[in-house]
Design a protein with these regions (language model features):
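Generic detector of leucine side chains in alpha-helical contexts
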Residues: 12, 21, 34-39, 72-73, ...
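Negatively charged, low-complexity tracts enriched in Asp/Glu with abundant Ser/Thr
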Residues: 1-67, 149-176
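Canonical SH2 domain fold
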Residues: 70-92, 98-102
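Polybasic, proline/glycine-rich intrinsically disordered low-complexity segments
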Residues: 95-176
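Generic structural hydrophobic/aromatic packing signal, biased to beta-strands
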Residues: 1, 50, 86, 100-102, ...
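Generic structural motif
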Residues: 4, 55, 77-79, 91-93, ...
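Short, surface-exposed beta-strand/loop "edge" segments at domain boundaries and coil↔beta transitions
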Residues: 59, 80-85, 106-112
Length: 176
């Protein structure tokens, strides 16, 4: 599988207006490899372009996962707007998130709820990058929309949905 890079898709630079996301996660070696591969859209329904950027994360000559640290960047595929940034750092057995942010540029992203942004980012990682079964987190205020409509604008695919007030349960890691 080919690794996504900044030049794999048309993108805008990361926004100047950002909010700290406080996203916390750790990933095993196999999951880290999937994160580093990223995601290049193949169809119109693919709403995200995701790539890892960090020269210290080059593949090692010996077998095993990459080493170092860098940023996993999440862009909307149609506009190129960069919505999320996740700084990964190598840890024993995988990688962990050491910093994260969400765009607060109102011309590029209308979201303002940091708690929902953490849930959505976790969903994007689980469903799109790790290919785990995942439930799409519905935000407050879209309850009157027909089932699947809001989700389609965000991810373009059909996933089970959770109500806005439901506790968010990330997909189970394959790591033990």
């Amino acid at each position: 599988m080919t690794r996504a890079s900044r030049t794999s898709w048309k993108t805008l630079p990361p926004p100047q207006q950002r909010e700290a996301l406080g996203f916390a996660a750790a990933f095993n070696d196999a999951e880290t490899e999937l994160l580093v591969l990223g995601l290049v859209p193949k169809e119109m329904e693919d709403k995200w372009f995701i790539y890892f950027e960090g020269p210290a994360y080059r593949q090692q000559a010996s077998p095993g996962p990459a080493s170092g640290q860098g940023w996993l960047l999440f862009h909307r595929s149609w506009t190129g707007a960069c919505i999320y940034g996740v700084h990964l750092e190598r840890s024993p057995g995988g990688a962990r998130v050491v910093d994260s942010w969400v765009s607060r540029d109102p011309a590029q992203y209308k979201g303002t709820d940091v708690e929902y942004d953490r849930k959505l980012l976790r969903f994007l990682i689980d469903a799109l990058l790790l290919r785990l079964p995942a439930v799409f987190p519905m935000p407050a205020g879209v309850e009157s929309a027909p089932a699947g409509v809001y989700q389609h604008t965000v991810v373009g695919r059909a996933y089970p949905e959770s109500p806005p007030d439901a506790p968010f349960m990330p997909a189970q890691s394959r790591a033990k």
